């Protein structure tokens, strides 16, 4: 039985991954401030933790793996980049609460700690917080490594790059180079037929229609533009209703629609059953887009990435070394490229 602690747990991506792998799991606690996300989590996992937790006393917990994806808004380019300095009281500075919790655990520190955050966490203005986080983890007995992982390398047709930092207690740095990757699936496997999608997903606002770009390469920067989905979507965000960064689906010449909430959940690796359980407790308004379920998808972490991490950490399953993956490991306080 693997015991996990989920901080900033959202809708439970790591727990979904463990479930999909058939690994017996006990969630000893789950911390999430969004009440609607808590509803979805408990609907998906049989109400094992039917309460919202906002504080954790570390010394009462004995997890094997601690997972945290602290708020990204103050790291993100899309936000105001306020940063995450300890004591700054920004949302992203909550990352230091994880350090405080582990400090309280004493001899019961988790064997593995996994932290996920946006690509901009390694930008020149933000990198000092990431480096200090790893330094604090090293003081607690952990070796650290991190890599930029893309959901497209794990089967999902979504361009979503995020840094994953894995800290190992009293062991060698985690090696990302032999993670099992999965070929990207066809985006049509995730998108419903237009005839099955309600008309209220059709883009009608002139201001939005004027921003749709069918020509540019989907890998290019789309500042102020909205891409048309071809081989894959761009990053699913929590603001799909207002600014569909992911792109829009072309119905016919000059006619487009938004991704549905269900499609966004699929593109993060969730099953249709997961989505419908969440919908049952967050039904939204009739004939309106469901902002809560869009937000939950946009704030989540791709389930297949956790599946690959857990296949290595727990099951010992690896692939041939991938020399194309850029990995950084902290050894004796120095960052080195592997």
Feature roles, as predicted:
Residues 12, 35, 96, 127-131, ...:
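A structural signal for well-ordered alpha-helical segments within the folded catalytic domains
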Residues 19-23, 43-46, 79-83, 127-130, ...:
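Short, glycine/charged-enriched secondary-structure capping and boundary segments
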Residues 5, 65-67:
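N-terminal Rossmann-like NAD(P) cofactor-binding module of classical short-chain dehydrogenase/reductase
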Residues 206-338:
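C-terminal target-recognition/interaction regions appended to catalytic cores
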Residues 2-57:
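SAM cofactor-binding core of SAM-dependent methyltransferases
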Residues 58-65, 75-242, 255-257:
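Class I S-adenosyl-L-methionine
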Residues 16-20, 43, 100-103, 135, ...:
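Short, well-ordered alpha-helices that flank and scaffold nucleotide-derived cofactor binding pockets
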Residues 71:
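Short glycine-/small-residue-rich Rossmann-like dinucleotide-binding loops
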């Amino acid at each position: 039985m693997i015991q996990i602690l989920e901080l900033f747990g959202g809708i439970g991506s790591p727990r979904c991954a463990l479930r999909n792998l058939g690994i017996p799991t006990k969630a000893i606690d789950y911390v999430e401030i969004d009440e609607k996300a808590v509803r979805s989590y408990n609907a998906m996992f049989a109400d094992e933790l039917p309460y919202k937790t906002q504080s954790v006393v570390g010394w009462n917990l004995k997890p094997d793996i601690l997972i945290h994806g602290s708020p990204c808004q103050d790291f993100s380019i899309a936000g105001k980049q306020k940063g995450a300095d300890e004591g700054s009281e920004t949302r992203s500075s909550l990352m230091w609460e994880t350090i405080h919790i582990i400090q309280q655990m004493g001899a019961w520190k988790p064997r593995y700690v996994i932290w996920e955050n946006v690509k901009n966490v390694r930008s020149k203005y933000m990198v000092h917080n990431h480096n200090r986080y790893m330094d604090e983890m090293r003081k607690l007995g952990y070796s650290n490594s991190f890599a930029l992982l893309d959901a497209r390398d794990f089967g999902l047709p979504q361009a979503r790059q995020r840094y994953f930092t894995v800290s190992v207690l009293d062991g060698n740095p985690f090696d990302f180079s032999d993670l099992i990757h999965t070929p990207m699936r066809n985006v049509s496997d995730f998108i419903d037929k237009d005839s099955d999608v309600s008309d209220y997903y059709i883009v009608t606002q002139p201001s939005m229609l004027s921003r749709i770009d069918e020509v540019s390469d989907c890998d290019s920067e789309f500042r102020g533009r909205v891409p048309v989905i071809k081989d894959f979507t761009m990053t699913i965000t929590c603001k799909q209703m207002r600014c569909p960064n992911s792109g829009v689906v072309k119905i016919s010449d000059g006619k487009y629609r938004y991704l549905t909430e269900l499609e966004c959940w699929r593109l993060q690796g969730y099953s249709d059953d997961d989505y419908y359980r969440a919908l049952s407790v967050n039904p939204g308004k009739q004939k309106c887009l469901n902002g809560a379920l869009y937000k939950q998808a946009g704030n989540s972490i791709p389930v297949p990435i956790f599946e690959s991490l857990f296949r290595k950490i727990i099951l010992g399953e690896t692939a041939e070394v991938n020399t194309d993956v850029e990995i950084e490991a902290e050894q004796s306080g120095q960052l080195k490229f592997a």
